[in-house]
Amino acid sequence: VWLIQWAKSRSEQNPFGVPIPNFAQVTKTIYRGALPDEAGYRGLIEKVGVVRVCSIIEHEVRADKERALAAGITEWRHIAFSDRDAPAPARVREWLAYIRTSDTQGALFTHCRGGRHRTGTLIAVYRVADCGWTKEQAFGEMMKYGWYDALGHRPLRDWFFHEFDPKDYEQKN
């Protein structure tokens, strides 16, 4: 089943024509997906006006930062998350604080390697904490973009359903 989910998510096209797997618009200024190549970064800038990137890959990938900045991304940020362990609440809050600036600081794109597990979990957190979605609705979106529990990813889902409390991540005005 997980292999089918993965293959399906890799093959779907997005309406923006941005050549990035699992690419989608979250809000008018927040986008999500997999690790872009050069064409992906150009597409982000040219097709949807992204100017900032937040990489959530566990270890900073210098080549990714260089690729993004060379393509014209004006700000690249790294906040490390594991794709096998429950996220640290402080890191989740840091990520939320950063993406919540997209309306005032410029459109942004957040990504992990495949745009499924870390990205899916954090976008689900955002959907529940800021958009009023239920956890079930947010998990449905995770599934749409290729979520699967196999290969050690189950702790992320367990954290989301059993430990994540949206009240702990509310936006402070």
Task: Outline where the language-model segments fall.
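Cys-dependent protein tyrosine phosphatase-like superfamily
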Residues: 1-108, 121-173
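Short cysteine clusters
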Residues: 112
